[in-house]
Regions:
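Serine-hydrolase catalytic machinery in alpha/beta-hydrolase-like enzymes
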Residues: 9-106, 194-199, 203
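Alpha/beta-hydrolase fold nucleophile elbow
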Residues: 105-117
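Active-site loop->helix "elbow" adjoining a glycine-rich segment at hydrolase catalytic centers
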Residues: 116-120, 141, 164
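A conserved short beta-strand
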Residues: 132-143
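Short beta-strand/loop motif that positions the catalytic acidic residue
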Residues: 153, 159-161
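Conserved alpha/beta-hydrolase "acid-adjacent" motif
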Residues: 166-171
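Catalytic histidine neighborhood in serine/cysteine hydrolases
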Residues: 179-194
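Catalytic active-site module of serine/aspartate enzymes centered on a nucleophile-bearing elbow/loop
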Residues: 199-221
Length: 221
């Protein structure tokens, strides 16, 4: 399916840098979800685009934000410099969140995060610094990269992991045990790390929508 009609390219500042993103805003949105992509990906990620489309259809706005500039992304591809730089990635998530708060159509909406791969560590770190984040979802994430701060996370947190993502499952379980907030660990049967199997991303979308709806602040939706 194509992109929602109200999807538009945006740019937002972070310190001296300017980053790119895509904003999808359904009419009467219930909340806005800031997406953080894994290293080697960007706001055009097909997998996150599919989840964002499902969120749009369910009444959730989204901002799929690049966490690296084009030059940084190129450098990272060659050297891996930013791949596990969770502090920098979290700073970019916070910048995207601040930008969303300046948009007239989004500034009053509850805020949630969705992180994939290393982006999961970034959104969890950002959620500790922004107490107004009401929910966090990790898809095939690396929350273990932020394990020291996980006990401080207050937002309701959902970890989604593929049942065949063998290297990631124990890391996810260890991270899950460190959380003290409202939490859930969902396993998508037969799915590998990228959730490329038939029906896997659809299940990710359903789980995400259910979680965001369940913890939506009262008076919304």
């Amino acid at each position: 399916m194509g992109a929602p009609a109200s999807e538009r390219e945006i740019s937002f500042p972070c310190g001296e840098e300017t980053l790119a993103g895509l904003l999808s805003m359904p009419k009467g949105a219930k909340a806005i979800v800031v997406f953080a992509h894994g290293s080697g990906s960007n706001h055009r990620s097909a997998r996150n685009a599919e989840v964002a489309r499902m969120l749009f259809d369910a009444g959730f706005a989204s901002m799929r934000a690049d966490l690296l500039t084009p030059d940084e992304a190129e450098l990272n591809e060659r050297t891996g410099q930013f791949q596990f730089d969770v502090a920098t990635l979290a700073e970019r998530v916070l910048a995207a969140s601040t930008f969303v708060g300046t948009l007239e159509e989004a500034q009053l909406l509850p805020l949630a995060y969705f992180g994939a791969s290393t982006g999961a560590a970034a959104v969890l770190t950002a959620a500790v610094k922004r107490r107004d984040v009401y929910a966090v979802v990790s898809r095939g994430g690396r929350p273990d990269l932020a394990i020291k701060i996980l006990p401080e996370v207050k937002a309701a947190t959902l970890f989604i992991v593929g049942g065949e993502d063998v290297p990631i499952i124990p890391l996810t379980e260890e991270s899950y045990a460190a959380l003290t907030c409202e939490k859930e660990l969902a396993v998508v049967p037969d799915a590998t790390h990228l959730f490329e199997e038939p029906g896997a991303l659809e299940m990710v979308g359903r789980l995400t929508i259910d979680w965001l709806t369940r913890f939506l602040p009262k008076g919304q939706g």
